[in-house]
């Protein structure tokens, strides 16, 4: 059984995202092993899912070289202000190593963002865009024939260095204060995997809110996009350009007023209409946007 080392993410969205990759590799017959630093990896005959800022020394670069194949998640070299002023948004790999990595034939560079149209990633060379997906191995649709909630939201403040998400979430969820909708909002509650699975499955509508940079640049989607569509089947999400490219038939909202109007619209529909929409959306996700469907990406 071939080993594949996967960067460990202990918290936040990265935890759930890389658990999805872990389960996908395991389902394909690999032996996935989490690592915290590249110093932990020795020997040969392994594949590797690494992150650019893991590579800080020549020894780290050697671990990349020794891998049969390295799937390297890369950050941009520069980024629009204000976000580009914070180290969270740009690559921390030393330039000399970046130049060496570009010449390694065993390194497959990828990003969640649509990088082909922008200059921020140009020093990396060719990069594959791998949008996030639904983890169909760790999440399972529960019986939703009897809904407990009209609308749900599960997420955190996710401070990316500018603490923008908190005010966005408060504004949007505050719109429901005087509505008659039955709401289930879990923000920074640390609910269990099982609770989240059940909450999304038992809600008519799943709400989605992206970060400010995602709204502005429109290059990538959050994990909640795919969980909401797969488990609830009805997603009300903000307008992000790449969402409309990936899911062209799904409406989006431009502001919090449009958001609540769209939620109320869905909740007013007859059940048979909701069921048709739900079935269409869930089929789209399960066929084209799951971690263990490796045909959706060149990561294989």
Which residues are covered by each model-predicted region?
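Nucleotide-sugar donor-binding catalytic core of glycosyltransferases
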Residues: 2-46, 51-67, 74-249, 292-294
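A charged, aromatic-enriched C-terminal amphipathic alpha-helix characteristic of glycosyltransferases
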Residues: 268-300
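Short, hydrophobic/aromatic alpha-helical segments in well-folded domains
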Residues: 224, 262, 280-281
